[in-house]
Amino acid sequence: MSEKFSPEFMAGVQLMSALMGMTLAFKKRFGDEAMKVAQGFTVQMGTMMGNKFKEKAGIKGSGIHDIERVYHVWLDPIIAPHKLKTNVEGNKLTVTRESPTVCPAIIVAKQMNLPLEMVCNNISMRMFEGIAKSVNPNAKHSSVQMSEHKCIEVIKIP
């Protein structure tokens, strides 16, 4: 598998695998509350990652186009040779991933024999949320569509 994907992609798989594994271990020991704690932790981690991406790209603003730029800094190297598909309308950013583009969450779900929704809702989407909040703390994330073939994420700011 690693021959097929970039080092950046594989780093994403490793990070998500570790987070999902710990989340499941804590859930087994402490119950469903552990899932909420893990989601909150992943949002915080996404915010820290977003701050690093902002610094790397020299992004200082807090607008929707700034969030879009940070997402490109984050995801373009991961999904290369593909590019992140984004669309901005007003204060709404739509991010779309379509097959043949693969994301690390799909690989993690397959490797761990988990529903994609579990990996995305607990880890991947929380990273999206945290990274958006690094640019604008009032950013709101929602997942419109989630499947192996197509995912649509929406970020809105007031």
Predicted regions and their residues:
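N-terminal accessory segment detector
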Residues: 1-120, 138-150, 157-158
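ATP phosphate-binding glycine-rich loop and adjacent ATP-lid/helix-beta elements
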Residues: 119-128
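Low-complexity, intrinsically disordered Gly/Pro/Thr-rich segments
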Residues: 127-143
